[in-house]
Every structure is written in structure tokens, then in C-alpha cells.
Amino acid sequence: MSRLKINLDAIERDGASATEGFCADGVRIGSLLVSSEGVRDNQGNLCVLSLSDLEVVPETEGGFLGKGSSGSVRRAVHRGSNKVVALKEIKVTGQTHINEIRRELETLHAGDFATPYLVSFYGAFAHEGSVFIAMEAMDGSLHELYKPVPPPVLACITRLMLKGLTYLHRNRHLIHRDLKPSNVLYNSRTGDIKISDFGVSSNLECTKADAHSFVGTVTYMSPERLRGEHYSYGADIWSLGLVVAELAVGVCPYAGLRGGSSEARFWALLQHLNGDGTALELPPEMDSDLADFISACVVKSPDRRPTCTELLRHPFIVRYTGAAPEAEAKPFSTTTPTVLAPGGLSSLLNRASPAAGSALPLASEGGTPKATSPSPAPVSPLTLSCPLERHDGETDADIADRTVVARWIHAVMKRAVLHKARGHGREELHQEPLAAVSASVATDSGEGGGAAGVSAASLDNGQAAQHREFRAERNLDGHSGDGGSAPVEEDCTAGVRSLTCDDLRWTSTGEPSVNLDDELNRLLF
């Protein structure tokens, strides 16, 4: 059976072709034709995916996930497998959008199955002037995550982000150019941390090349980019430092620039970064290794910033995650990524279908995507008594990191539900449970001794105790318990209300309500 293999060289070579754009059969992107039936390459191979394969979840039922660099992202359900996917729509109105779609398809397809640190790509199709890209659905972004994140957990999140950046820089020779909390996604059940939104990424022909275009989100841009100078991989390192700082402190690093007009705030930021002082003032009580890590990333001179490989050896990462520094220096596998069969999304998702006979109603043919599908059932809490599935190429340290992240998110979600049920305010939640959760995670992750020795199985007793305590607290509050069903160790989700992303978002500090990034981008572009 023939397989679709996207010719990345042909895409890059034909990128400036005059034939790109709308045609009778769809939208031509380099050597690819994106039609209503899916993606066809120049050899005639077709990766099948169409609107009729999907049902878009209504916005009133949590269907709207957010906006990318130039398109909206909605939740959809693949009717053949009942699996939830993220469906990104990019309205094609010019060459800029053609370029973005090319970058998305190239990066997602090349990274799919080659690394677990980028969101998976399922397929694409064209419909009524837009290109829709189906990707792996995640639970949320770091923008929505409870903040501040305790250092032991933050180190695990940061290490997983670094693994994704290492793949982009070393294997794909790509600068992401828009790394920010909303472009780093998490899965609360598995602890996966994945980089997304490659619409403004830039390819470097060799490791010494640099770029010069001005795209991305202004408040996470490095000084050399703000000045319009040439830049390289160090620009992503700067953005990473700001993301880590935001997770550590709980607010956008340059939130204080919200006063005045958009133009005044932009020039204030540029003046600050061009000054002689440090780029970022960190709280004196911050963990010393964490502060040193952030400071190393946000050095104003790009030549003095460390690489991803060097940061993976930083004391902040090694201390809390226990990952062997020499192991991180090994290059990623350069094997050819798995390619999709002609069945496309349908064949890929049906292999992992959670249940048979759960197909959804047919999507309507023609017209705009109909938001008529019922919202997918809430995902039950993470069951840490079962070891997390190992991704291809993962080490024990990777699994340990994901376990710590998943457990922390799960603990915060449970406390949020409990406080919400008791009628406590958001401020009370921020004052009390974080310290307890942080202490618990720090102990279990082996603060000072590394988290590499932490396995999912080793968390069984503690997790079971947490669920027993949580159920007891719910009973005291007049909520139903587990009904005395299966033992906790065998089913630690029994009797516990299903937790959804909304439970976690309720506790989110988030970025400032005034979106400085959007205002500055409107000013500049």
C-alpha cells in the first residue's frame, strides 16, 4: 500500500512558486495540493481527511480552544474513532498565510512520531477559503496553568520544553520564533509538555545561519529581534527564559509596561532592554538555581546565551530532575518519521480507538463546519497507579518528569474542585493549597536528589491515600463517596468526580487581562 510522504525539499524549493495559492482543486502549497479530500503530494499520494470525518464541538460546550498566530483552534471529534482532535483553521487571504501553512505542515509532519515533544499531526484539508489542520488535542497551555509553579515541578516542565527545542534546533534547524506560554501545551493525564504553533517558525540552512524577519509575539522577543537585527537559535532561548520566569513568578515578566499607549509601552520595553541594567529583576527569595537558569537565558548579548544542550546540564535541571547530563548530549534519532497511510487520520485514529460503536453522527456536507456534536465526555482523573506509557526514544528520566508534572496538575485540580465546592474564593485557593502541593511534589520528586528515580508505580500508595482523603473530605461536605466499589489501588478514580480543564482554568492566574502582545503587534504590523 502506498504511503504519503511529504517531500520537504520540494516544499522548500517550490515555496516561492507563482503557482501557489487557490486553484480549481483546492490550495496549492509548494509541492502539495490541499483539497477538500485531504493532502496530495506531487506523486499523487493522498492523505485522506475531510470535513465529513469530523464534528466540531460547539463553542458553548468548550469547543473553542484559542487562537494561533493567524487562525482559530477548535475542538473536534473524529467520528470514526470518537477521538478528540484540535482543528486549526487558517484563512488563506495571501502569500503570508500560504507561508504559514507550509511551515505548519512541514514542521508538524517532520516532527510527528520522531519526537514526543511536538504536537502530533493527523492531516489537513481545505474548505471555503480556509485550510484546516488536524492536530493532537491537549488539555490546555502553560498560559492557563496554575501559577506560580514550584521549582521541582517547573524543572520537569522546563526540561521537557528543552527537549522539544533541542529537536527543533538540532534536527530540524528551526527557530520557533513565537515561544510563549500559550504555545506550550500540556496533557494532565500523561504529563506531556509539547510545543505547538509553528506558523512563524523559520528554517536555517545551517547552524551558523541567522534570520532577520520580525514576526512573533513582541513581549517575548529577544533584544536583537526587537532591534531588527539578525538572530539565531538564541532568540528562542531568550523566550524560554521569559516563559520559565512567568511560570515561576506567576505574572508576565513585563506586565508593568501596561500603562500608557501601545507605542509608549513598546518604546519603554525597547529602552529597558537597550539599557545597561539586567533584562529581568527576579525576586530575591527565588530559588538560586532557578534564578541563575533564567538569568542565563535572558542575557542581552545573544552570543552569551547557552544552547539547549548546555541548559539541560544546568544545576537547576540536574538538581530537581536528576537527569544525567551526559545522556542529554546525545543527538535525537534521525530515523525517517512514520508517514500516514492513504487512510490518513481515519486509519491512524482507528488503531487507537477507545471503544467500538461510539461513532458520532455524520457531519453535514457542504457549508460551514457545523457545531452540532455533543461535547466529549470529561476525562477522568489521572490514574497514577498505572505506569505511564513510554514514548519512543524516552528515557526513565523523561517518564519521571512527566509523572511529576501529571501528579502536580492532578493535585491542584482536586484542590480547586474542593475549594470551589466549599464556596471558597480564588484568592484563598492561591494562599493555602499551593504550599502543601509544592511540598508534596518536592518530597516525591526527591528535591536535591533528583526525580529520575521516581516511577509511576512508586506513587501508588501516596496517590491512593490522596484519593481516600479527597473522598472523605467530599463526604464531610455532603458529597457522595465511592459507594464502596473496587479497591482504591485497583481503581483510584472510583467515586471521584471527573475533572475537566475548566476546573484547572478556574485556578489560573494567567497573563495580564490587557493583552500587551496583541496591542503591540497591531501597532507594529
From Swiss-Prot:
It is an enzyme of class 2 (transferase). ATP binds at residues 65-73, 88. The active site is at 178 (proton acceptor). Signal peptide: none annotated. SUPFAM superfamilies: Protein kinase-like (PK-like). It catalyses: L-tyrosyl-[protein] + ATP = O-phospho-L-tyrosyl-[protein] + ADP + H(+); L-seryl-[protein] + ATP = O-phospho-L-seryl-[protein] + ADP + H(+); L-threonyl-[protein] + ATP = O-phospho-L-threonyl-[protein] + ADP + H(+). Residues 358-367 have a biased composition (Low complexity). CDD domains: PKc_MAPKK_plant_like. It holds the Pfam family Pkinase. Its cofactor is Mg(2+). Its EC number is 2.7.12.2. Disulfide bonds: none annotated. GO terms for biological process: MAPK cascade. Mn(2+) was used in the in vitro kinase assay but Mg(2+) is likely to be the in vivo cofactor. GO terms for molecular function: ATP binding; MAP kinase kinase activity; metal ion binding; protein serine kinase activity; protein serine/threonine kinase activator activity; protein serine/threonine kinase activity; protein tyrosine kinase activity. Belongs to the protein kinase superfamily. STE Ser/Thr protein kinase family. MAP kinase kinase subfamily. This is Mitogen-activated protein kinase kinase 5. It comes from Leishmania mexicana.
